[in-house]
Swiss-Prot record:
Transmembrane segments: none annotated. Keywords: Amidation, Disulfide bond, Ion channel impairing toxin, Knottin, Secreted, Signal, Toxin. The keyword Mitochondrion does not apply. It comes from the Eukaryota. This is U15-theraphotoxin-Cg1a. The lineage of its organism: Eukaryota, Metazoa, Ecdysozoa, Arthropoda, Chelicerata. It comes from Chilobrachys guangxiensis (Chinese earth tiger tarantula). The modification Alanine amide is found at residue 81. Disulfide bonds join 51-66, 58-71, 65-77. One of its GO terms (cellular component) is extracellular region. Belongs to the neurotoxin 10 (Hwtx-1) family. 66 (Jztx-24) subfamily.
Length: 83
């Protein structure tokens, strides 16, 4: 009888260790998934443009509008007429 109880306690201790180890592995996999999601999120953020797009404020002296646009007298990037 004492041996059966001792064996039951040893089995419970072993089961506890196995469950704890599997939780650690599961936690690590969750951390990997979350870090991958956050890494992708950084890639999806809009990049800063080097030039100004249509209708955006600009500075005529800097000529900071994108190709085929010019800085109008209203200090907005506009489409070049002609070519």
């Amino acid at each position: 009888m004492k041996a059966a109880i001792l064996l039951a306690f040893a089995g419970l201790a072993l089961l506890s260790v196995i469950c704890h180890a599997s939780e650690n592995v599961e936690q690590d996999s969750f951390e990997e998934v979350f870090s991958a999601i956050f890494a992708m999120e950084d890639d999806l953020k809009p990049k800063e443009r080097v030039c100004r797009g249509y209708g955006l404020p600009c500075t005529p002296e800097k000529n900071d509008c994108c190709q085929r646009l010019y800085c109008s007298q209203h200090r907005l990037c506009s489409v070049k007429a002609g070519k």
